[in-house]
A protein has these predicted regions:
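Hydrophobic/aromatic-rich alpha-helical bundle segments in the mid-to-C-terminal region
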Residues: 85-92, 105-155
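Short, basic, alpha-helical segments at the C-terminal edge of helix-turn-helix-like DNA-binding modules
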Residues: 31-37
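Helix-turn-helix
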Residues: 1-28
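Hydrophobic alpha-helical connector segments
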Residues: 28, 39-70
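An amphipathic alpha-helix signature
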Residues: 52, 96-103, 115
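Short alpha-helical scaffolding segments that buttress acidic/His motifs in well-ordered protein cores
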Residues: 58-59, 73-77, 121-125
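Amphipathic alpha-helical segments used for helix-helix packing
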Residues: 51-53, 65-92
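Short amphipathic alpha-helical interaction patches enriched in hydrophobic/aromatic residues
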Residues: 37, 41, 62, 80-84, ...
Length: 155
């Protein structure tokens, strides 16, 4: 942060002065990053993808192989549990927004069924992405993505 502020001709103290604490800064960053998600734009835009297309896009080798531009839930999910309440609150709200948006695309005869499918889908997507990135065998990683996409994509 010091280097960034120095290049901008500012002090890092002045930057931090805009926040009550470093925890508040972390919560604000989390909320902003989650609010600018390309996935969320696809879920709420005028040309929504099909449920199965969305699952396939998320569980693609391209998404797996680009963690720096990928899903914040997969990147930070296991770490956020050790973060302050304000960061966890921002993370929770971001997840709720995605679950609600995904439920509008999910198959199901009732709102409750679509919400349940959405929750299970988010858990499966994030878990599969984490596992596919963690293993050191490319074929096994592809197999994880394919199995999850097939299973989750079923109505």
């Amino acid at each position: 942060m010091t280097d960034i502020m120095k290049r901008a001709g500012l002090t890092h103290g002045g930057f931090y002065g805009h926040f009550a604490s470093k925890d508040d800064l972390a919560a604000e960053i989390t909320a902003r990053v989650l609010g600018r998600s390309g996935w969320m734009e696809r879920l709420t835009g005028t040309q929504k993808p099909s449920f199965s297309d969305l699952v396939r896009q998320y569980l693609s080798p391209r998404h797996r192989d680009d963690p720096g531009r990928g899903c914040l839930f997969a990147a930070l999910g296991s770490d956020v549990v050790r973060q302050p309440r304000s960061v966890r609150r921002a993370f929770t709200e971001g997840l709720r927004l995605r679950v609600d948006a995904l439920a509008r695309l999910a198959p199901g005869r009732s709102a409750a069924a679509r919400r349940q499918k959405s929750l299970a889908t988010m858990a499966g997507l994030v878990g599969a992405l984490i596992l596919s990135r963690a293993v050191d065998d490319p074929k096994f990683s592809d197999e994880i993505l394919e199995a999850a996409a097939t299973s989750i994509g079923r109505s």
